[in-house]
A protein has these predicted regions:
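Residues on one face of amphipathic alpha-helical coiled coils
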Residues: 116, 120-123, 160, 164-167, ...
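Amphipathic, well-packed alpha-helical segments that form the structural scaffold of globular domains
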Residues: 122, 126, 196, 200, ...
Length: 307
């Protein structure tokens, strides 16, 4: 979610849109101009920031900077290829498609991490299948069980999280380049299909000027559920690391200190961080749900929250 990555995606979307227009041959841009734009399109984050300080509009600042690079080597008096950049598009076409692409990128990372954690829990479930421990209900000793059961329970929960994440990834992998209020009055639907196909996104079958935020809210809800699983695992190990129990503990490397006042302590700080951060993820899901209800075909009340 760095600015550099966002701008790189913006650049690719704008270039692909120009190539789509050239492919159609309707608005006047030639294949040669599209190829020129592809070759010369660049941006400088610092320069974009400087322009935005004046325009107070991030998309205009980016397009201005990108256009300067595209036209820098054009001979004097020749038409400027940058005039075709962003043709018929709105800021939402660019920003929403890029955001969904970023969410896919981020979800892919999370999917791989959840897959790895699930495999670890599955492996440990078999390794510890005969390791006896105390089962507790209401925090009180109940009946004997095995550590393998704990790991197995976590493994299955992570498998369900993985299935939900894969579905949520598919649900958020959408793009929309449909112009003002989503009517395609200023841009041919072919451009949307062309750009989305090359980004690996589906094109939204009916967007307004923005991609409906139920896509994003669904992903946020799944992420909150996954965070709750991590919270559950971390909380269990924290409880088992209590001095009075000490059935399990997180790693504590050589030279690590537990307390400035009590050096004998081995605090479960990593697990506590997991529990704390899970609260942030779950709280952010509520924001995503609130972003679904926008005014008419678009407002930007969601934008500041998403940023």
């Amino acid at each position: 979610f760095s600015l550099e990555n966002k701008y790189a995606i913006w650049q690719e979307i704008e270039v692909l849109a120009c190539e789509a227009h050239a492919e159609m041959g309707k608005i006047g841009i030639t294949r040669e101009e599209a190829a020129w734009i592809r070759e010369h399109a660049k941006f400088s984050k610092e320069e974009v920031d400087a322009i935005e300080a004046v325009t107070n509009h991030d998309v205009i600042a980016f397009l201005t900077n990108m256009g300067e690079y595209i036209d820098a080597e054009v001979p004097e008096g020749e038409p400027k290829p940058s005039r075709w950049v962003h043709y018929g598009m709105t800021s939402s076409d660019l920003g929403d498609t890029a955001l969904c692409y970023q969410l896919v990128q981020a979800t892919d990372i999370i999917i791989e991490d959840v897959r790895k954690l699930g495999e670890i829990c599955r492996r440990r479930a078999f390794e510890e299948r005969e390791t006896l421990c105390v089962g507790r209900t209401h925090g009180i000793h109940a009946e004997p069980m095995t550590f393998g059961m704990k790991f197995g329970s976590w493994a299955w929960e992570l498998k369900r999280d993985l299935d939900r994440l894969l579905d949520a990834r598919k649900n958020v992998a959408f793009g929309a380049i449909s112009g003002a209020v989503g009517t395609y009055s200023s841009i041919d639907p072919f451009v949307e299909e062309y750009v989305c196909e090359r980004l690996g996104l589906a094109h939204d079958p009916l967007s307004t000027q923005v991609i409906s935020r139920d896509h994003h809210a669904y992903l946020a809800g799944v992420l909150a559920t996954t965070a709750a699983t991590c919270d559950r695992i971390a909380t269990e190990i924290r409880n088992l690391q209590k001095t009075d129990t000490l059935e399990a503990e997180e790693p504590f490397k050589k030279g690590q200190k537990g307390s400035s006042a009590m050096p004998h302590k081995r605090n479960p700080i990593t697990l506590e961080k997991v529990c704390g951060l899970s609260r942030v993820v779950k709280a952010n899901a509520q924001v995503a749900f609130d972003n679904v209800a926008l005014w008419h075909e678009r407002d930007i009340s969601h934008s500041s929250a998403e940023r």
